[in-house]
């Protein structure tokens, strides 16, 4: 409308400016008229145009009215459709939300059911697996026992075998069912997850549709509310909006249809899931029923097994009773046979008597006939005959009674033989039955034992191979490094000796030229007087020096094999330059230099002319060397006075130059021999290195040269050399050796000599004098204070009474060196050439030195952490009693007590190679004991006898176990090196596995034996004295041995049964301390039959008297039996007492 008004204004408004009349000049009248006409014409034309436009607008209005009517009709129609569609929409949304809530609740319930089904399925699976394991484990044994037990009843065997087969098939069926159910559950869970995702998406779409419908409804309401006049633009906008609303309604229709379809699909899927869940529940119910049936079958099998076990126990008891009855019957049979033999002898005697009486009767009849013939009329003869006839009738009656007795005895013997045959038949049947039972049990046990032994052998073989390879590698490395050090040291010695030879040759040349010049010139008179005055002293000194010089090569080279003298600590310092020289070692170096200079100066100053010439020809030593020489000459080293006088007076004394030349020539010969020996040693070292490279995987042994941790090694300790795992004694040849595991090794003698090669130590007088002169270095340890000083005094430290006792122990050990030599022959040093007597003397000296090391360390109360390597090795060998291979491994790996005390159980196994846990326990307990003994802050222990080593593993195995009646375990105890300090630390597992003590009663016997040792404070002497005191008196039952109990049984008149106590584990401590061990248990151990009532009553009477006397003495306040039993059980480790 605004557009049409604008056009009207444009058409009506003239283009003539109205202000022109006022502003212009005067207008003429004709122009005014023309203008008016023109104006009228224009107005008419404008009116025509306006009418046309009005008609056009009327037409347009009519058209618009028609359009609006049509639009209103369409709007009404759309509104009715919208109302139709939206009329049921809120109810459907509510129903859909309720259905969604129900579906969610159902899904949660199904999830819970699924979780429960999973748990139950897992439980059933575990139960089935357990049942399968049980059946597979016991199938063979059950089948064998069933076949043996019911060999005649084939129906029972087949039924049980079928039960086993059915169980197996049931297991397989349930496995397959589990797999199927698991697969179905996985598929159903996947479908539920997808459906939940679809539901969430559809819910989002429904919410968006609801929002759109709400917006469209609001717009429609706004459109209906606004009934304002509608022009062309409004009608177009409403038309567009209606079109959009129609499209949106179409989309909503399609989306609602799709959502309905999806909801129907979801309901169908839920129905399917419910069906699957019901099927799973039915399968679960069936599985539970099968499990119940299996449980019932298992209970039946357990009942059958318990029934079989009870039957086996009853059979065993019957067998034992039958065995005891058979022994009793045998004893009765022996008695009856003995009585029968006596009766036979009596019958023979009676027969002989009857025969003699018949002979006498015949003689009497003959005499009677003769007498009747001679004197029939004599009454006295008749009376006499009458008496003789009466005697004969009495003899006949006696013979008849003897025959009757013989017949009765025959009948009794026949009855007893019949009873004996019946008893033998019963015994044979019992033996056959027990043999069948024992064969089945033995087969089962042997099969399991074979499997365990095979597995154990494989593990032990792998472990042994690993340990052997590591030890071979370590030993080879050490020997190779040692050979390299020997080679370097020999090269250095060779070079130094070559330089010394060159210097001596130069000095000899200078001496000879000086001698030649002295002969060319005259000798001054004043000098000759000095020669006359000093000649005797110089000659004596020269002779003594010459003798000493001559003795030195003899001392040095009298050893076998022409080996050069060992330099002891100096060679060790040359091998290892990192070691610190002490003050005494530095003085010893200076002393050697001064000794060489003194020898050369003494040789050069022997002639009178050489004193003057030597000052010009010989190079003077520096002042430091001169002071060292003066110190050596004046320090009182112990040189002979003649030698000192010769060295002091030789500067001005005269002597034949030939003596000087011979001395120098001897010195050169000795140096040449030194050079040859050094070359020989170098050759040995090279050959050893080559052989070690070739045989590094076949031969391993300890290095031949061992360094010392003390600053000065004594001669005995320097000569002590031991191969790491050599177990041969010193008097056995080196052709055959044994490795650590006892396997023989055949080694070439040449290789043994090369590996054992060590330059021996040659003692000259300067060595001994220096040892007397030197004081102990501050760096030396207390344990090595006895090394070096051969005759020096030792300081006695004030120690406690316990350590004084330890000193007496080691003094006592020194007196019994021969016994130690016999017992510890495996610990001897490496094989050396020489006689057997010299080897034993060297061994005794080495043992004495080890005892001195330990005694000195204990007297000085040196803490165990400060002990050095040799003292720790001596302690392991003499105190702990470890085998030679463990001692050698400790010598190679442990250099101090601190290292030893810091070793853990794993490090002991890895570094020292102790694989047996009881051996490691022995070492750890010994270390703890020594640390507590030597610690200054630790209190004194009351059980010092443990430390003395009196109850070592040899005493435990050879003496103590037989006294307990457990001699059958001696080999296991000796293999485990079990000593007294280990007894309280044994567990039940150690007794069963390592000591092979499976019998519960034997373990109980061992426990009460340990309690007896506790009561005597582990004192072997006290125990022996108490046993000796009660040897012939029935007192002190606590210390009775198994043999003493047997003698007591013989004393009470039951000697027939005493042999049954051998290896039974019955001793005095068990009888005295175990209150559950009564007379019936003792009779059972003695194998006295239950029908032998008199012997049982006798044993019970004597046993009660013996035990009551002891228990009244030991326990004045008796308690109840249960409390005493609990106290006895609650000891250091658990035992099941004998019942």
Curated annotation (Swiss-Prot):
A single cellular component GO annotation: neuron projection
Ubl conjugation among keywords: no
Tissue distribution: Detected in vulval muscle and other cells near the vulva; in neurons located in the lateral ganglion, posterior ganglion, ventral cord and lateral body; and in pharyngeal and body wall muscle cells.
Name of the protein this chain belongs to: Liprin-alpha
Function of the molecule: May play a role in regulating the structure of the neuronal region, called the active zone, from which synaptic vesicles send neurotransmitter signals across the synapse. This may be in association with the liprin-beta protein hlb-1.
Location of the SAM domain: 867-933, 952-1016, 1040-1109
GO MF: cytoskeletal motor activator activity; kinesin binding; protein homodimerization activity; signaling receptor complex adaptor activity
Polar residues composition bias: residue spans: 704-719, 778-787
Highest taxon, organism lineage: Eukaryota
Annotated stretches, region: Disordered: 700-720, 764-847
Cell compartments where the protein resides: Synapse
Gene3D superfamilies on file: Transcription Factor, Ets-1
Signal sequence range: none
Biological process according to GO: anterograde synaptic vesicle transport; axo-dendritic transport; egg-laying behavior; locomotion; locomotory behavior; neuromuscular synaptic transmission; positive regulation of anterograde synaptic vesicle transport; positive regulation of presynapse assembly
Positions in coiled-coil regions: 30-144, 172-298, 329-517, 655-701
Keywords, in A-Z order: Coiled coil, Repeat, Synapse
Annotated family: Belongs to the liprin family. Liprin-alpha subfamily.
InterPro entries, per database record: Liprin, Liprin-alpha_SAM_rpt_1, Liprin-alpha_SAM_rpt_2, Liprin-alpha_SAM_rpt_3, SAM, SAM/pointed_sf
